[in-house]
């Protein structure tokens, strides 16, 4: 919150995830409803998808997710040294933020594709993997997405994806 990347909208109290360009200018905002009965999700008009919600670390790894909440859920399950790695949420099944991050961070040598465990997510994982000319691996959540994996792990089920970090 101190970096102004997540905040609460004043109108509907949505969580807003902000993506910045390499000059620190906000270029993308994704809203997600915070009320259980409200599953609202959407990008703010005029958002540039190549700058969607992301975190730049210093390691050679980047993890790409469909949604910011999945990215944060994954980090919650893998807290140790999480700041070292880079993470991005496409806010869709697009690869634009990934290729922007690769362009901005030439030290990245390993891509982990972490889209949802559904047809759209897995099709996107394969499509993007085919485009990459660097080391990549597809990580599939056990349940529908990484947020569900976190929810179930908090209920006592085994956490997912130990080997990655």
Set out the residue ranges of the language-model regions:
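Basic, glycine-enriched DNA-binding surface that flanks or lies within the catalytic cores of DNA
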Residues: 1-56
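Cytosolic beta-strand hydrophobic patch enriched in CBS
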Residues: 16-19, 63, 88-90
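Helix N-cap/beta->alpha junction signal
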Residues: 66-67, 117
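TOPRIM fold recognition
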Residues: 76-165
